[in-house]
Amino acid sequence: MDSIVTEVTYGLEIKKIKDITELPFPVRQDSPLTEVLPTDLKTKDNFVARDPDLLRLTGSHPFNSEPPLTKLYDSGFLTPVSLHFVRNHGPVPYVPDENILDWEVSIEGMVETPYKIKLSDIMEQFDIYSTPVTMVCAGNRRKEQNMVKKGAGFNWGAAGTSTSLWTGCMLGDVIGKARPSKRARFVWMEGADNPANGAYRTCIRLSWCMDPERCIMIAYQQNGEWLHPDHGKPLRVVIPGVIGGRSVKWLKKLVVSDRPSENWYHYFDNRVLPTMVTPEMAKSDDRWWKDERYAIYDLNLQTIICKPENQQVIKISEDEYEIAGFGYNGGGVRIGRIEVSLDKGKSWKLADIDYPEDRYREAGYFRLFGGLVNVCDRMSCLCWCFWKLKVPLSELARSKDILIRGMDERMMVQPRTMYWNVTSMLNNWWYRVAIIREGESLRFEHPVVANKPGGWMDRVKAEGGDILDNNWGEVDDTVKQAERRPHIDEDLEMMCNREKMDVVIKYSEFEAHKDSETEPWFAVKGQVFDGSSYLEDHPGGAQSILMVSGEDATDDFIAIHSSFAKKLLPSMHLGRLEEVSSVTKVKSVEQNVKREVLLDPRKWHKITLAEKEVISSDSRIFKFDLEHSEQLSGLPTGKHLFLRLKDSSGKYVMRAYTPKSSNSLRGRLEILIKVYFPNREYPNGGIMTNLIENLQVGNQIEVKGPVGEFEYVKCGHCSFNNKPYQMKHFVMISGGSGITPTYQVLQAIFSDPEDRTSVQLFFGNKKVDDILLREELDHIQEKYPEQFKVDYSLSDLDHLPENWSGVRGRLTFDILDTYVRGKKMGEYMLLVCGPPGMNGVVENWCNARKLDKQYVVYF
């Protein structure tokens, strides 16, 4: 460090200073968290301690979170590590403390001298700096865009930003040592995590790495402590002024290149596509994603209101109230002004801005946490600022809202209008807080709440307002507005025949179809439909329609059907039900009574989670107590049941499952479920499986059934579509969690000493760890080797165990031919439950071999 002034303004290390509050610049040193939360103990992150105050945005795993907005603001310039927002694409890599200094990074690609270096050597060989940097997720404020039109990403509120003191070396120094080629333009960065679509890799421009104004770091400490696992322990990249998605965590590799990264995450994440590109267009054409012009690097200008808080109530008086919040910008450009409007943007008031980063700049050179603080060497602004404005409460009482906007030193100003895009990223239209007068008090509404309903956007949307109109969808006589339309029910728009909307169906006529097996009429949202034309084609079988004949099926229908399914209903629409609001509905969930059998195909009943057994990183056995200890489930072998829960918005979500437990088990119901956690392709993950995953012991879930067209009786006797069969053999084709219905039949066969039905099972999975119930299946095969055979198949050929003796690859015609060779049609039946690709192979094989459909059951 001879080239840098070493006579620092503050000659003592920060740990030796008794009272850091006396320093003229912000400093904090956080004590590491130690307690792992119960939710995380059940995931691959079972070693990561986290703050329970963080708002989880994607369920329990992977962990994505932001702090409560007020708590973030009240923490001040430097955010506690425990409250720093988190964006993880998968499980956190486990790095023991004793291995931190041996962590190794490779530098390769278009360089003269590629090399590898350990963290201990980085600390010894390179100049070390401590720098305050604000990090921001590109999806910050995404939920506001999703309220207008659902995009591809999960919901973020306005608190997806945090600031820390990062300690490490400059990325440019590490790259410079390898002597990059003059033709090189980019640096690829790769982490050690392994999310759903492979290792996370992205890139930045090489010239930025070499620019001291950019101050791009490789950091190993945050606020004076080793990196927390969620934030990249033991080593990460920190890129100020750029979206957080470029600051790769758990850094393992740096590759110098002449082109941008070609990694999946670089292509399909962190892009702002043109606003006219719909989710369907983006999904069907990769060219949108691979256009580097749409890649996000620098942050855009953003200002947020934190005070008043959402739903805060203030009594009107003669006092003043201080409106306050924060702002940030990208590319190192300072925010030059922040303005507040109390009259819908007609006039603006200039807020006072505080730039805490400048206090480091003014202090000169000094050392913190073993690193030189040299903010004074640069002009760039890499941190957020804080603003405030005092206004009379009487003026707030005359206002309908508070608006905020910023302008940077380039005179770029925040837009009034939202720029909607598929990823809902970089949303920075004016932040608006609505003011609701309630007598002599004022209540304030922020746009949204990150992980639950709430805010003025929810209210406006429910009232039928247009969030994007000239008054944000609010009713205001002083502002010219388009005629306010009643709220349009999107479900009915898809489901109804406009010509039948005025046809009235008498309730007596509707009720006459109760229990009808030929003309099943059912009601959804007050409209009547005739399901008879779809009995044979319904994917869930005719029984799914017949069980709601003559009843209001609103909750169940909306909970389980996609938009595609809803668009099939106009041809079945008969009209609206007479005085549906005045009809007394039978209560759908009855009080627990001492009933011998739990299930009822027409009524929901509640069961209670008693235990959750973690089988693997994404598979669990949920064990539910029935209504009393002697009660049977009442589920025939081969059929399934419905489970339903309410999501965070209060809407029912319903899915069909087949229990793992035998139907002879009393007082308990065990269901094996594979949890589909959120990922890039499906940012919300499996909605129902994540709701079930978040259940706590003692929570209740609703159950109804049985449903399904197949039932196994005993000794080869079964029924399918109400027709009896006598089978000698079953060929079972299962994939992943689709093993559960076939396992039900297996249990019935091999628990009966008189049952000699033979079974051949093909069980396909991606990796060895994905194979469910393997111990149970192997036990049956060992005990009945002549009667039962199972072929395990793995499709991920790049990660096959060396000693793998099972099938390699996916299901083929040859495999199916082998299974039925020597068997006569009519003596065997196929039982199939797998993903669409696997089911498609079976269907094509059946067509090619002219196998009658009556012998093929798709669960």
Swiss-Prot record:
| Pfam families assigned to the protein according to its UniProt record, in alphabetical order | Cyt-b5, FAD_binding_6, Mo-co_dimer, NAD_binding_1, Oxidored_molyb
Per UniProt, the keywords (alphabetical) are: Disulfide bond, FAD, Flavoprotein, Heme, Iron, Metal-binding, Molybdenum, NADP, Nitrate assimilation, Oxidoreductase
The cofactor(s) it depends on are:
FAD; heme; Mo-molybdopterin
Q: Reaction(s) catalyzed by this protein?
A: nitrite + NADP(+) + H2O = nitrate + NADPH + H(+)
> Where on this chain does FAD bind?
655-658, 672-677, 687-689, 737, 740
Annotated residues that bind Mo-molybdopterin are located at C137
Binding sites annotated in the UniProt record for NADP(+): M829, L830, L831, V832, C833, G834, P835, P836, G837, M838
Top EC group: oxidoreductase
- Which InterPro entries does this one have? Cbr1-like_FAD-bd_dom, Cyt_B5-like_heme/steroid-bd, Cyt_B5-like_heme/steroid_sf, Cyt_B5_heme-BS, FAD-bd_FR_type, Flavoprot_Pyr_Nucl_cyt_Rdtase, FNR_nucleotide-bd, Ig_E-set
Nuclease as UniProt keyword: no
**Matches recorded under Gene3D superfamilies:** 2.60.40.650, Cytochrome b5-like heme/steroid binding domain (3.10.120.10), Nucleotide-binding domain of ferredoxin-NADP reductase (FNR) module (3.40.50.80), Oxidoreductase, molybdopterin-binding domain (3.90.420.10), Translation factors (2.40.30.10)
Entry note: cofactor: Binds 1 FAD. Binds 1 heme group. The heme group is called cytochrome b-557.
Among the GO molecular function terms of this UniProt record, one is:
molybdopterin cofactor binding
Please name the GO terms of the biological process aspect recorded for this protein, alphabetically. Answer: nitrate assimilation; nitric oxide biosynthetic process; sulfur compound metabolic process
Ranges where the FAD-binding FR-type domain occurs: 602-713
Which residues make up the binding site for heme? Answer: H538, H561
Query: According to the UniProt entry, what is the EC number of this protein?
Result: 1.7.1.3
Looking up PROSITE patterns in the UniProt record yields: CYTOCHROME_B5_1 (PS00191), CYTOCHROME_B5_2 (PS50255), FAD_FR (PS51384), MOLYBDOPTERIN_EUK (PS00559)
Domain Cytochrome b5 heme-binding: where? Answer: 502-578
According to its UniProt entry, what is the function of this protein? Nitrate reductase is a key enzyme involved in the first step of nitrate assimilation in plants, fungi and bacteria.
Q: Which family does it belong to?
A: Belongs to the nitrate reductase family.
Q: How does the annotation summarize its subunit structure?
A: Homodimer.
Protein name from the UniProt record: Nitrate reductase [NADPH]
Whichever gene encodes this chain, its name is YNR1
